[in-house]
């Protein structure tokens, strides 16, 4: 028995050797380091930990398995999905081919590609969301709409930087500050950009308390920030029950492509408000939401293979995503300023920044900044109106872009 030969063979077949022997292996080593950094941000810095930890570990698994000689035993096979999307391939849109050759993370990713996970996340979000503040002040819809400005400005910026229309639309939706919506649209239009777009979307959502306050100070005066708003009216139970039914009917008829997101959002909210499906509401808010989050985050992380992530496009996406988020915040604030004057200075424009759909973080930032300038001010419930309007607004914006570029 040749002991030295056996040891040499084992060493050459190990994953450590593959990083240096395999063509491009060093890139996967970089991706593994990036996964470690993301795990640090999620666990230690608590940047969207429920999503970022899963995304980071999915990234770690896919880069450990695919390029260390595992071949058909890899957890994720990007070439399967390239064939799935290639119209010239005999396996175009063939889930059967994917499933017959899939690794574990490929099976997970089917739920992303089919739009199942983002829709189920919206079901849970709907079950957790109280649309009462929006119903009490319907004008909040305008703030939710104005906060989508960054989506379309970033889209134009992406086109100017050489991205295609579908890619630009996927990048622009980062401005909606809604991770599931960004994942849903990107999977449909530009799946090769899913990793960097998801990372950008969730990172900027976590950085809301740092990004928004300087912009709020820039766009408003001290007098505006001190405005104390009157308590909103009480919303009846009947209004809360009718609302999801009406919104689902109107929005889906207007933009059929929004049906998966808006339909699930309003179904979840109906479970919450109707009073006869408490068990379903509780399941959607807790067990289902947690299970889907695990699959969604891990499968999104699995797409972060080196050849897609380590490129100049990723840097552009990070920059454009920040611009989209900042411009959306400014759009909401400018809408708030307009409403401040239109209402006879009775509306505090700080609630406009909550028009991005990061619920309830953006509303809390409005509350914190408002209290800084007026200790007696309580803007949280007022800010929740545009905040939940932003959830609907981002879904509508995604539906519009999908209708235009989805073919």
Where in the sequence are the language-model features?
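Hydrophobic transmembrane alpha-helices of secondary-active transporters
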Residues: 38, 109-135, 269-271, 289-311
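Membrane-embedded hairpin module used as a gating/binding unit in multi-pass transport
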Residues: 203-276
